Design a protein with these regions (language model features):
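Structured helix-beta-strand junction loops
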Residues: 20-21, 72-73, 144
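Short, basic/aromatic recognition patches
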Residues: 2-25
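Short beta-strand segments
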Residues: 21-62, 70, 78-82, 90
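Short acidic (Asp/Glu) patches
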Residues: 61-64, 74-80, 126-135
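Charged, gly/pro-rich active-site loop segments
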Residues: 2-8, 87-167
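Short, solvent-exposed aromatic-acidic interface loops
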Residues: 60-65, 115-118
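A generic structural signal for nonpolar/aromatic side chains embedded in well-ordered alpha-helices
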Residues: 18, 69-70, 114, 150
Length: 167
């Protein structure tokens, strides 16, 4: 078995990893052809019927550089990674087509969902609802934001912990 196959995550492992991490790096192609990389908060949602999942969603300001980039080329590469030492490195890279959604009825609930996820410290019980001032802030921001639906086309995964400290 190749090293590549040895470190590859299963579908369940990759889904659990994505659910447990909190920041995705989103790479789009900038106006001068250089990659434009930015961190994003995200949530995972079930995919539409008949599709494999989960599907990653985020939001950003509608006038952001990444949205301008996606208007020219709707492709993005996403990476979620963890670990510091080589034998601890693990991650998921997704090549995606991005659907930029402008409808407030899509954007506002997504913003609430994102803030609900991040209102809870890592490892703590989820909050039952957002504090009212946070919910109001999200509602105000929603009119300036867009939803980003990342439709996965290809994936690569790695988990160097599977090598048992060797390479």
């Amino acid at each position: 078995m190749s090293r590549r196959e040895q470190i590859k995550m299963s579908e369940d492992e990759a889904s659990a990893f994505l659910a447990g991490e909190r920041t995705v790096t989103c790479a789009t192609q900038g106006p001068r052809g250089w990659p434009h990389l930015m961190p994003l908060w995200y949530v995972l949602r079930d995919p539409p019927a008949g599709e494999q999942g989960p599907r990653l969603w985020s939001w950003t300001y509608g006038v952001s550089q990444k949205v301008n980039n996606l208007g020219r080329d709707p492709r993005a590469t996403l990476q979620v990674e963890a670990g510091e030492l080589y034998q601890e490195l693990r991650g998921v890279m997704l090549e995606c087509e991005v659907r930029v959604r402008h409808e407030l009825e899509t954007v506002a609930p997504l913003g609430q969902e994102i803030f609900h996820r991040y209102a809870t410290p890592r490892g703590a019980e989820p909050v039952s609802e957002l504090p009212p001032e946070v919910a109001q802030m999200v509602e105000k921001q929603a009119v300036k934001r867009v939803a980003l639906e990342f439709v996965e086309l290809r994936r690569a995964t790695w988990d160097h912990r599977k090598l048992g400290g060797t390479y």
